């Protein structure tokens, strides 16, 4: 899980979702998991 000011989709499997006010990237590749904060 990377915590970044700017979350971007890294590959075609990355999906940007908003969970309880927090922007997250979920992906099949666990290295691509990100959270905005």
Swiss-Prot record:
Domain of life: Bacteria
GO CC, any one term: cytoplasm
GO molecular function: structural constituent of ribosome
Keywords: Ribonucleoprotein, Ribosomal protein
Gene Ontology BP terms: translation
InterPro entries: Ribosomal_bL36, Ribosomal_bL36_sp
Family named by the database record: Belongs to the bacterial ribosomal protein bL36 family.
Protein name: Large ribosomal subunit protein bL36
Organism per entry: Ureaplasma parvum serovar 3 (strain ATCC 700970)
